[in-house]
From Swiss-Prot:
Biological processes annotated in GO: respiratory electron transport chain
InterPro entries: AioA/IdrA_3Fe-4S (IPR041632), AioA/IdrA_lsu (IPR014066), Asp_de-COase-like_dom_sf (IPR009010), MoPterin_dinucl-bd_dom (IPR006657), Mopterin_OxRdtase (IPR006656), Prok_molybdopt-oxidoreductase (IPR050123)
Binding site for [3Fe-4S] cluster: C22, C25, C29
A Pfam family of this chain: Molybdopterin
Protein's UniProt name: Arsenite oxidase subunit AioA
Assembly and binders: Heterodimer consisting of a large and a small subunit.
Class of this enzyme: oxidoreductase
Protein's organism: Alcaligenes faecalis
NCBIfam families per record: arsenite_ox_L
Family, per entry: Belongs to the prokaryotic molybdopterin-containing oxidoreductase family.
Co-factor binding details: Binds 1 [3Fe-4S] cluster per subunit. Binds 1 molybdenum-bis(molybdopterin guanine dinucleotide) (Mo-bis-MGD) cofactor per subunit.
A GO molecular-function annotation: molybdopterin cofactor binding
Transmembrane intervals: none
Site (Involved in charge transfer) location in chain: S100
Length: 826
């Protein structure tokens, strides 16, 4: 999205060029950043511009993806101004030069005093008296570290709470997960930590990992090699755009048939097929039908929350048909018979529960698991995301799905895989979590626990389950501290620490937000610390096929903002100095080891030390071969990087990685076998069932293509705000008529857990009694009506809530300016 502009300044041939992985979704498209002095520009002849393209004539289609939104003018700390251009890299195997609406705006979101990023935090900001004031890092650290120290001394680590990112991409990455993790887990040693998108410190894939199969186990190329692709609880066009466009669609179009024949010469290859499992007909379904036709696309529009029954029915059927890999099961797995017995569900029972006709279930099974004419089992890839991750008992759904996948040997063979599609990129390197159980942090806060709460690179006021209850509790507790601080006129920093601590003894909570912007958390915060994002810092992350790349720094961050890992180091060093001053050598020693000057120092301290002699325990997605990865080697690898785990490095080949896991039949369990896991169908959780019985509408929710996460950038983009002035809710037109609402009307959405407001968006493809609301938006928070239910691992059922809807009124401006045409673009 960009404003009309009749020309773009081209980079001169000598412009600086660096590598950038897209900040946003897990696909991690490769981009090049060009930077050159503001008053210079390149010519239209290919030798006169850094793109090497001939702009003197019409370029061929897709010769380059280039829009005004991919350009900006930035100012360095020394006052010098530079043009920047952030364009997709055609040589990157991930995106092959394709851009997305999210990545295509990266340049626009780099900080400029008058641009979309003008609201960025530029200095630590303190809530003083009744207003926000910018302050110094030294002052901020004296207050923040001083309060942590007092809490540790008086209450121990249990008084210090965090909600923190655990991902890659912007606001994450291996450097930053290590810096924050080392501070929280090794230095402060608090177990009172939750992750950005779930209310405890846990995994989203406990079951699959226990079964021996990590969730990112294939390569994007495997989607090109598959006979059948399953998309389960996932909308890949909108959520993983260029994985879908650059790897899935070419297979559906027949463009990868020659590659399949070359790889597997003894197999026949019918035209590729795709199966969607989703109660909602998404834009991805519409596009797939347009590309492949109805005869190669199945949409299993299951009843909400019935995924486990679906997979159990299919598992039972393929076992009965003999469409399983018996030698593989015998040699490389454990627990098959128990799973067959526990998961047994006939197709008739499966159909009654899921609402999917028996003939459609049989067709899905035949496409995916019945041997091909050449005798081999189909190569079937199962890709899943939030419909399972945030589904009806994540643990059991994953178990049921993987039982089916293991039995049919659709993991460890090229063209297969049972994989998460993912949200953010990945980038996890941390010390082991210091707790012995999973703690529901939101509920602890609601109950009045904790003295200091830091939200780091996340915003649970917009994203948590049962969000309204969380906000109400935090705002009430925060107000107690604000009132105490307002009365402490003339207090020194040390005295203010005492004032704040006393207020927390009276039920208060000191709130800190570390982020790019003053998010909705500013309503509760007392201190905000300014962070940096890729391009303003060096950052490594890995994408959904475990491909690690280096996003290189090319500009200064705004003001005194800095990388999260360096913020963590600053906090740790402040605490070390305080304990040394007190003569507490043992406590001071906990905060040693943060003498980092650059992001590379943090990368070397964490990612590269994992599994090495003399290093402490480090949980890292780079594993024990991460030491082979250096910034210099990643620079040489460009936007293609290397797929983790790294196998080797030498001067001629560079970094050599791993395309697919489990190809030799050895899995991540103690005995090296894949473990089947019994997964009975148990219906809906009681809390959720109560809402369904009481209220009319299923309140489904998720992302769309244009808005990234909480709209932390997008809320400042005028075009985005014109398109989505508030969160929309897709509704069936007949339901709209019954409620007397049309596109642009405002409705209240409510149930026993809260209420929120949304803009009506009529959609013919939405079933009656079902809705879909934009998740995590800044204006209209869907999480207010999700329940407080979680599974055994404290994983919420974000998708599982029901409520009623009532008309509030009409917004004539919305009706006049917002398009309510179908988003099923095909």
């Amino acid at each position: 999205m960009s404003r009309p502009n009749d020309r773009i300044t081209l980079p001169p041939a000598n412009a600086q060029r660096t590598n950038m992985t897209c900040h946003f979704c897990i696909v991690g498209c490769g981009y090049h950043v060009y930077k050159w002095p503001e008053l210079q520009e390149g010519g239209r002849a290919p030798e006169q511009n850094a793109l090497g393209l001939d702009f003197r004539k019409q370029l061929p289609p897709l010769a380059v993806t280039l829009t005004p939104a991919m350009t900006n003018v930035v100012t360095e700390h020394n006052g010098r101004r530079y043009n920047i251009m952030v364009v997709p890299d055609k040589a990157c195997v991930v995106n092959s030069g394709l851009s997305s609406t999210r990545g295509g705006k990266m340049a626009s979101y780099m900080y400029t005093p008058t641009g979309d990023g003008k609201q960025r935090l530029k200095a630590p900001r303190l809530y003083a008296a009744d207003q926000w004031v910018d302050t110094t890092w030294d002052h901020a650290m004296a207050l923040y570290a001083g309060l942590i120290k007092k809490t540790l001394d008086k209450d121990g680590p249990q008084g210090v709470f965090f909600s923190c990112f655990d991902h890659g991409g912007a606001g994450g990455g291996f450097e930053n997960t290590w810096g924050t993790g080392k501070l929280m887990f090794s230095a402060i040693q608090t177990p009172m930590v939750r992750i950005h998108n779930r209310p405890a410190y846990n995994s989203e894939c406990h079951a699959t990992r226990e079964m021996g199969i990590g969730e990112l186990n294939n390569a994007y190329e495997d989607a090109q090699l598959a006979d059948v692709i399953w998309s389960i609880g996932n909308n890949p066009y909108e959520s993983q755009t260029n994985y879908f466009l650059n790897h899935w669609l070419p297979n559906l179009q027949g463009a990868t048939t020659s590659k399949k024949k070359e790889r597997f010469p003894n197999e026949n290859f019918p035209q590729a097929r795709i199966i969607f499992v989703d109660p909602r007909e998404t834009p991805s379904v519409a596009i797939a039908r347009h590309v492949a036709g109805n005869d190669r696309v199945l949409h299993l529009a299951i009843e909400p929350g019935t995924d486990t029954a679906l997979f159990n029915g299919l598992f039972t059927y393929v076992v009965e048909q003999g469409w399983i890999d018996k030698p593989f099961i015998e040699a490389h797995t454990k627990g098959f018979d128990d799973a067959v017995k526990t998961n047994r569900l006939s197709l008739d029972e499966c159909s009654n529960i899921t609402g999917v006709p028996v003939d459609m279930l049989k067709r899905a099974a035949e496409w995916s698991y019945k041997p091909k004419a050449s005798g081999q089992a189909p190569r079937t890839m199962h890709a899943y995301e939030k419909g399972i991750i945030w589904g009806n008992d994540n643990y059991v759904i994953q178990s049921a799905l993987l039982d089916l996948v293991i039995a049919t040997h659709n993991v460890g063979r090229r063209g297969t895989g049972c994989v998460r599609m993912g949200g953010h990129q990945e980038g996890y390197t941390r010390p082991p979590y210091p707790g012995d159980k999973k703690i529901y942090i939101d509920q602890e806060l609601i109950k009045g626990k904790g003295r200091i709460m830091t939200w780091w690179g996340c915003n649970n006021f917009q994203t948590s389950n049962n969000a309204q209850a969380l906000r109400e509790a935090i705002l009430q507790r925060s107000a107690i501290v604000k009132q105490a601080m307002q009365k402490a006129r003339g207090a020194t920093t040390e005295e203010m620490v005492d004032v704040i601590y006393e207020a927390t003894q009276n039920g208060g909570l000191f709130v800190t937000s570390i982020n790019l912007y003053p998010t909705k958390l500013a309503e509760a915060a007392h201190l905000m610390l300014p962070a940096a994002h890729p391009g303003e810092m060096n950052l490594t992350s890995m994408n959904g096929e475990r491909r690690i790349r280096l996003s290189e720094k090319f500009m200064d961050p705004p003001g005194t903002a800095m990388a999260d890992c360096l913020i963590a180091a600053r906090i740790a060093n402040a605490l070390r100095d305080m304990y040394q001053k007190d003569g507490k050598a043992e406590m001071a020693a906990q905060f040693e080891g943060f003498d980092w000057k650059t992001e590379e120092d943090a990368f070397n301290d964490g990612f590269r030390r994992a599994g090495q002699p003399g290093a402490p325990a480090i949980d890292s997605q780079g594993g024990s071969t991460g030491h082979l990865v250096t910034y210099d080697r990643l620079r040489k690898s460009g936007n293609n990087g290397v797929q983790l785990p790294v196998v080797s490095w030498d001067e001629s080949k560079g970094l050599v990685g791993t395309e697919m896991l489990y190809t030799e039949g050895k899995f991540d369990t103690d005995d090296g076998k894949a473990h089947f896991k019994p997964a009975p169908w148990n219906g809906l959780p009681a809390t959720v069932q109560q809402q369904k019985d009481k209220y009319r509408f299923w309140l489904n929710n998720g992302r769309n293509n244009e808005v990234w996460q909480t709209a932390y950038h997008d809320q400042y983009n005028s075009l985005m705000q014109e398109r989505y002035p508030m969160a929309y809710i897709e509704m069936n037109p007949d339901d709209c008529k019954q409620l007397d609402v049309t596109g642009g009307d405002i409705v209240e959405v409510y149930n026993d857990f809260g209420s929120t407001f949304a803009m009506v968006y009529p959609v013919a493809e939405i079933k009656r009694g079902q809705t879909f609301m934009l998740f995590g938006y800044v204006n209209g928070i869907q999480g207010d009506v999700t329940t407080d239910w979680t599974d055994r691992n404290i994983i919420p059922y974000y998708k599982g809530t029901w409520g009623d809807i009532r008309k509030v009124g009409s917004m004539e401006e919305f009706k006049r300016t917002v398009s309510f045409k179908s988003r099923r673009f095909a």
